[in-house]
């Protein structure tokens, strides 16, 4: 009985283990696993369908085909359990052992394992110091290798050709030993003394000075050390015996019609067995050497193909011309074991169907079709029916459910009540793509979804489908309810603002409610309370839009009826002022945010639901609709267009007269049209946005229009100003697919209709948009995958790591304007030191406290500009990040809890908006979004002008001209605080003087945005140097205008440097500043503006460099730029940056490059070579600081790291990534990018190993490095030195500690090969490894601390 009982027992927890180790298996190990040798290539007998004996499916080796039944049928049933049949040799046992029992094949001749041979760097090659070519020659029987030179002049490991070998044998006879094939390689490997080798190599390394040699030695040492430290033997990389996979993992399935479907592995094994058997037979027959050799080579190839098809030689194809899937292919790629079956499993208890809107659901509910619920909750229903006594057996319950009797439906209702289900919409780009709801049973076949959660799911109702999943265990239900319920996910984890915000109809309805209409019924009446207003409205005495006065508390408030009705749904804690305005989408989002912060989560949920109901009701009542009459075309449109045409004509004239180049003509034309489009749009908005309403007494008031199109755009419900511009203004400039802007715009709008040509130009942009969208999705998904992989194991690991370090944050400025306030950047972070009031020096925020909304207000009021905060970048936790360094968990609005998987949240927050980023496209059906070039700066606040680091001269017209690069103008308020600051472009005309008081909006400076001038600071006569026509300068004749201009061209000679010098009246070169000379070097492409001998005044333009033809403003924009930053690739034409502070000088030019010399006050000068034709942005005598670029272009992040250190490079990466997202209007909190950058900066490169075991140039994780160094210091040994290392996200993911995680990411075979040689142990610390091993993840409720609670 006991035995029977053990059969039905539930299996206990699967094998409990703490780590996984991977090794190379020894031949003994393989024989140990095996249950018998496979000797024949046969599979099964096609007539009896029984497996052949000793074949690939042999029942004697692998176990019976049917449960408890031997092959010949002598023993059947349970009573013979464990008996081995004497007739057919099959053990009587469950057939599932065929999934786990392995066999083996004894090879007649050893073969090399292809992974250890071909996976670069080749493991076998590195141990023997042979190249891959040489190794293959030996293994594939092309050359002999010397095993023992004996008394000959040969060396061990030398290769001999066939002829050379014969010759040596004739000369020396058997005085030396050489071999061929895998046997000889095996002999060499077995004879290696690794300890001795390692010592020799280390010595050699310390002696050599050549970098290349050192790298090579380090590579070899790494592999030798791996073998030394693991228990692997090098000769195991050559195999005498190969394992055979259990047959049920490579099944053979009979199809109808007597044919079989088989796994490719069976074909591959069959080839190996056939060749092996043939080789054995040939060896027995003592066949000639050449035949045996050929057979051995074929065996080696067959085994290669079995392990990794296509790695060497031709890919073997099956009968259907498709490549056969080898063992490696089973693991690799999206369809491989890792990503298909371990990381992405399909689950039971799930269903999917179309979604429809559920306008009367509460936020925590979803509508579930009864049919679906019945299927999903079957086991629960069976259980309940039995409990209630309707049925006695499961079978009866099943029948009852199939008949769908009334009791079944009642039971279903009971089961479903308060049972959360999870809804998921693919693609799940962030964690809000799966949320839990309580199901409400409905008729019909579609899931009903609450409209407010659509933003989070990115769902709409045009045929989207969603999947339902049922959490089965009590723990799963609790997690679904507490963590995943839609009501607990009001804030977005990416930026901490509410994500449950009304949109579309709801916004429109509430906007309509809160608008004011003049002369409405009941205008200016006074009411004593909200209730009174409600009565008047219900009785029809006051209109919804009437302006009224209402007593609120103890004051009288001017408001409208609609706003009072809206205020009825507000929670107590919120003031009436929150809704006493026109409510558009932005204001509504703010309302929900305010409610969350003041009244709490429950009130917010109720408010959201009530807003939804009100919004729908009033949107319906308003009866808004669009007609063609609503698109009013501005009266001044034709006038604006005529002006623009005239301006363009004027530019054409200037071009024809040769005053400007073709590029400038194009730039200016594009600019004029961009401005004209803006003007038409502004006129249209003016006309559509206001309307004059006549009163009963004939008086009129101008108010915001009730034009439906305007109302939809203005409320943020649908459409944008841009789209309105295209409907009723003009379509404007369009872009070619290449990204250039076509200089003739589309002057028509959709209301007027487009001509055929205009329509054709439009299709250009529109089609490119569609093609791009398809590419973008794939690219964005790949970026997300890499981000998740690099940061998956970052979790909150401890409350405080105790670091004293942090980062400095200030408001983000661009062109003098604040784009992101300091408050927005520090909200929810922890102060790293006391934050003091700059005036009173009182502590506003003590060190180590959270900077919350109130404290942000204090900091901003005090006018503090820079704050030091804790950051993930400087966190000292060994694994993960501590709560203090991370700060607030944005989705909850309070400090993060231990176990929060912040790495994955960071990756999702950055990856999810990826699809909204451009792949260099232009929005709005391809209308070019070209910002009108800035040509001037105006201040925003009153104050006094201060010039900072600004050199100026007066030119011949008496204007002040800026003569240097990094000059700035700042506006100082009366209290002496700096209000704003602007960088002044070189060559700008300054309209104010230092110390001048200015009013707001004064013109400070202006410049020509389309050219960069080269100016002189001194007076004198112009003298050309090395400017020779036909060599370095050409008179370029403009074909259209017949005018000529002098242009500097590319020149061959390296010592020629075209320049203009300014000579004084004595004919000497004039002096500039402290000992510099007035020589100006002309870059390629400069257009000379003066002639030889001209009289020159200070501030004159000697030459101008036309800017590149305007492409739409982003060099590498959008998604590719984000990927480039995270992969830290060198930008295409990266800027050279200076490594030291110093003064700029120019040296002798070399071939195609110009030499810039930076001379510091003390120490050696540094030379930088800059390609000719690149515009150098510094001048002789300029003072530069370390890290400043010397030319135009994006800097290379690696340079920033070496010059300015980790914090600066982190700051650069965070700011650059943010800039791309900001251009698209996407909000992401800095801390997410910091978490990713932390992972990129996790390692150091060893520069000096000291007394440690490290190798020169090895990459080591910081904690490990520090730990070993502290040990060395304790033992009074020399610690190792290292420099910080910045790895791209792909590189960083592949070099993680966990080989399981790395193998499931990319380059599976390489990762596994490296891991096996090193005998790596995976301690399963990250999330991914645990998912793959099928365990709970060590984050959130799966953390060890919480797991103990569960027990």
Swiss-Prot record:
Binds 1 Mg(2+) ion per subunit. Binds 2 Zn(2+) ions per subunit. GO terms for biological process: DNA-templated transcription. The keyword Repressor does not apply. InterPro entries: DNA-dir_RpoC_beta_prime, DNA-dir_RpoC_beta_prime_bact, RNA_pol_asu, RNA_pol_N, RNA_pol_Rpb1_1, RNA_pol_Rpb1_3, RNA_pol_Rpb1_3_sf, RNA_pol_Rpb1_4. The keyword NADP does not apply. Its EC number is 2.7.7.6. Mg(2+) binds at residues 460, 462, 464. This is DNA-directed RNA polymerase subunit beta'. It comes from Syntrophobacter fumaroxidans (strain DSM 10017 / MPOB). The lineage of its organism: Bacteria, Pseudomonadati, Thermodesulfobacteriota, Syntrophobacteria, Syntrophobacterales.
